[in-house]
């Protein structure tokens, strides 16, 4: 039997009726904000974050109705299924375990018969070692200069999450290692990046699960040619974040470093995987810190 569509549930119809009421002029946000207790009633704190929805056109009844709908759709049970490794992407037969990248409790997370945590910890530790070697100068550019710039090359979820986090935490960034993002195939984006960097001190981080994404490879090829034109070996200043066995994870054409992505982590949720951990650990130094608050 197929599952009832959400818009056929009585809880949905209750919300529709409530929405009509909330669209009345007396429920305008400017009137709702006159309530001095509104901020306390419409906010949450946790994990070092403050969530404020007091500026949304909702009241306590709205939230109660939304919670009723969530209960009818078994949101908590489905979330528990997701974080425990259940198949929640039936079209591809995959788990969705971005949450596992935020775990530091040592507990296993099973996908079928496999505990995925050892592989996640292995990548996490490898990224930590790599970023440490960049920061202490053990790893340098092909001419022996310390890295001063990191350019993330990607598109969609392969760059957007890391860029958001980098901007939000830029006051804590390492001022000696500037982070740049190259996502647009418009030549102006590439031109702006190369104007801001020194090729001898630039580390290129190319992020693509398949390593066949047309836009990402177009920019990666531009970057490689930019380096070659200046007498530099692009592979010695290249890091790839990609699926194991992809063209970007080729032992016959090795980059300075390569970190694997997992098929159970989708692009838009990948910031706490190597996708975000590599650039953010280089810019923000402490690899575990960006992921720890998100556990809650």
Feature locations, PLM:
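Expand to "…catalyze enediolate/carbanion chemistry for C-C bond making/breaking, isomerization
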Residues: 2-4
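Extended, charge-enriched "interface" segments that sit outside catalytic cores
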Residues: 6-14, 18-143
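Single, functionally critical "micro-switch" positions that shape active/binding sites
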Residues: 32-34, 153, 291
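Glycine-rich phosphate-binding loops that contact phosphosugars or nucleotide phosphates
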Residues: 129-137, 144-288
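Single conserved hydrophobic/aromatic residue that forms the stacking wall/gate
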Residues: 286-296
């Amino acid at each position: 039997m197929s599952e009832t569509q959400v818009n056929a549930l009585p809880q949905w119809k209750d919300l529709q009726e409530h929405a009509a009421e909330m669209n009345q002029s007396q429920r305008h946000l400017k009137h709702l904000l006159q309530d001095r207790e509104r901020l306390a009633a419409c906010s949450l704190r946790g994990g070092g974050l403050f969530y404020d929805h007091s500026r949304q056109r909702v009241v306590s009844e709205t939230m109660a109705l939304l919670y009723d709908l969530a209960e009818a759709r078994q949101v908590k049970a489905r979330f528990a299924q997701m974080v425990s490794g259940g198949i929640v992407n039936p079209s591809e037969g995959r788990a969705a375990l971005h949450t596992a990248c935020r775990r530091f409790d040592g507990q296993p997370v099973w996908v079928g018969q496999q505990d995925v945590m050892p592989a996640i910890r292995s990548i996490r530790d490898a990224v930590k070692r790599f970023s440490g070697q960049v920061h202490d100068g053990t790893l340098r550019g092909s001419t022996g200069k310390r890295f001063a710039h990191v350019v993330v090359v990607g598109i969609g979820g392969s760059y957007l999450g890391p860029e958001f986090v980098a901007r939000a935490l830029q006051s804590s960034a390492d001022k000696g290692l500037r982070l740049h993002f190259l996502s647009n195939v418009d030549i102006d984006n590439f031109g702006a990046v190369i104007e801001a960097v020194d090729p001898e001190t630039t580390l290129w981080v190319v992020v693509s699960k398949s390593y066949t994404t047309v836009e990402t490879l177009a920019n990666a090829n531009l970057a490689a040619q930019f380096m070659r034109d200046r007498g530099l070996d692009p592979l010695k200043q290249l890091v790839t974040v990609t699926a194991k066995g992809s063209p970007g994870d080729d032992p016959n054409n090795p980059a300075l470093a390569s970190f694997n992505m997992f098929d159970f982590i989708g692009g838009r949720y990948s910031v706490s995987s190597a996708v975000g951990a590599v650039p953010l650990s280089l810019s923000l130094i402490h690899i575990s810190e960006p992921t720890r608050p998100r556990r809650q």
